[in-house]
Curated annotation (Swiss-Prot):
One of its GO terms (cellular component) is cytosol. Binds 1 pyruvoyl group covalently per subunit. One of its GO terms (molecular function) is aspartate 1-decarboxylase activity. InterPro entries: Asp_de-COase-like_dom_sf (IPR009010), Asp_decarbox (IPR003190). The gene is panD. It catalyses: L-aspartate + H(+) = beta-alanine + CO2. HAMAP family: PanD. The keyword Transmembrane helix does not apply. It comes from Streptomyces coelicolor (strain ATCC BAA-471 / A3(2) / M145). Keywords: Autocatalytic cleavage, Cytoplasm, Decarboxylase, Lyase, Pantothenate biosynthesis, Pyruvate, Schiff base, Zymogen. Is synthesized initially as an inactive proenzyme, which is activated by self-cleavage at a specific serine bond to produce a beta-subunit with a hydroxyl group at its C-terminus and an alpha-subunit with a pyruvoyl group at its N-terminus. This is Aspartate 1-decarboxylase. One of its GO terms (biological process) is alanine biosynthetic process. Its EC number is 4.1.1.11. The modification Pyruvic acid (Ser) is found at S25.
Length: 139
């Protein structure tokens, strides 16, 4: 049996651009890809914190250090510049692997610069007013 678990998460990134006429995908700053262990072409889920939209697409590598989070193609109808998003990738792993898998969690600021790295998918962004759910157990 395989289990599907969170592998990577870029938490509360700010969408910098949306291009309806570009062929699908999400463009992500190469620094963020490295930090989150994401590869070009990898499947990601996008959760729009601003409006609740959820979608899946694939990664395109963006210019390193640019802070780009670009929504391309039809998804630009759902996700807009300035929206806060969570980008999540998952891995299918065996039961044994699942018990030791530690996700790569990347926290960013309003300019999509890395402000924290970790493995706790429920940890709030460092320095923010966010709180962990009182029912959540720390990783």
């Amino acid at each position: 049996m395989l289990r599907t678990l969170i592998k990577s998460k870029i938490h509360r990134a700010t969408v910098t651009q949306a291009d309806l006429h570009y062929v699908g995908s999400v463009t992500i700053d190469a620094d963020l890809l490295d930090a989150a262990d994401l590869l070009p072409g990898e499947l990601v889920h996008i959760v729009d914190v601003t409006n609740g939209a959820r979608l899946e697409t694939y990664v395109i590598e963006g210019e390193r250090g640019s802070g780009v989070i670009g929504i391309n193609g039809a998804a630009a109808h759902l996700v807009h510049p300035g929206d806060l998003v969570i980008l999540i990738s998952y891995a299918q792993v065996t039961d044994a692997e699942a018990r030791s898998l530690r996700p790569r969690v990347v926290h960013v600021d309003g300019d999509n610069r890395i402000v924290g790295l970790g493995a706790d998918a429920s940890e709030p962004v460092p320095g923010s007013d966010q709180e962990r759910s009182p029912q959540a157990v720390s990783a």
